[in-house]
């Protein structure tokens, strides 16, 4: 046991000599050793104390140095695997990943013309913001995506394909004193020669199919202020649910995509047709 803990090989005789030199009585045969310390050694209370005495007399500097070993291998979560697959898919489609701040301006949803009564205005407000531009937690990623696209356009970047995976935050509408709802979201932004509604749709389809989402439907949407009314669609998939009358198919909305409305694009300084999805 002593040799195993210390990682060394000391004979029983050597250990006995160490203990006896400290005026301890040793009994037992073979691997069993019973050690009785003198009454003055009140600090010797357990097996580990005896092992420490052997290490001290043997010489701490002689003990081998080893890296601690763990029994359990670290594993990556399913959520992380999904995000990594989404990243790999978008990069394979020629998109660059961007990262933007979670603290944003409430004017962002105004700029993309979100309805006044929309849940996307249920902000988590910062108590001590550095300024209005960082006074709330974001509920959507699209404003930040359009800002990045606008900066690239102002620097004469001919084409952009970008995506972001990030958290969004929303006040608990049932009880504002409770912790906010935090969700993962993804935004995509394209502009440039050859880009149109259908290239974005193809990228969205490829992404969702890679993530194992089948039975996709793109439902025309004319009332979403961010997008051109004739070039916008809600992204949905069919899921099977079991109701009182047995299995039922139900459409589950996953997101929205389309050509950004010219008025919205102008606010971000984008002077060409651009396309976004979230």
Map each language-model feature to its residues.
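Extended beta-strand-rich architecture
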Residues: 1-278
């Amino acid at each position: 046991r002593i040799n195993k803990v210390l990682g060394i090989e000391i004979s029983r005789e050597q250990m006995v000599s160490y203990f006896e030199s400290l005026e301890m009585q040793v009994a037992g045969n073979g691997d069993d050793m019973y050690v009785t310390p003198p009454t003055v050694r009140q600090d010797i209370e357990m097996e580990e104390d005896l092992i420490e005495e052997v290490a001290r007399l043997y010489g701490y500097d002689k003990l081998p140095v080893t890296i601690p070993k763990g029994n359990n291998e670290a594993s990556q979560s399913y959520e992380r695997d999904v995000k990594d697959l989404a990243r790999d898919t978008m990069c394979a489609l020629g998109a660059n990943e961007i990262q933007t701040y979670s603290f944003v301006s409430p004017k962002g949803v105004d700029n993309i013309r979100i309805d006044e009564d929309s849940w996307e205005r249920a902000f988590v407000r910062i108590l001590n913001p550095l300024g209005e531009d960082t006074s709330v937690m974001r509920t959507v990623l699209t404003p930040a995506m359009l800002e990045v696209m606008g900066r690239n356009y102002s620097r004469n970047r001919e084409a952009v394909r970008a995506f972001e995976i990030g958290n969004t935050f929303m006040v608990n509408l049932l009880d504002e004193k409770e912790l906010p709802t935090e969700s993962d979201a993804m935004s995509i932004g394209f502009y440039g020669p050859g880009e149109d509604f259908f290239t974005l749709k193809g990228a969205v389809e490829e992404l969702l199919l890679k993530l194992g989402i089948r039975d996709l439907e793109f439902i025309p949407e004319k009332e979403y202020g961010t997008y051109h009314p004739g070039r916008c669609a809600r992204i949905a998939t069919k899921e099977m649910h079991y109701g009182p009358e047995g299995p039922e198919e139900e459409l589950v909305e996953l997101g929205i995509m389309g050509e950004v409305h010219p008025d919205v694009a102008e606010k971000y300084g984008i002077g060409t047709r651009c396309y976004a999805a979230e």
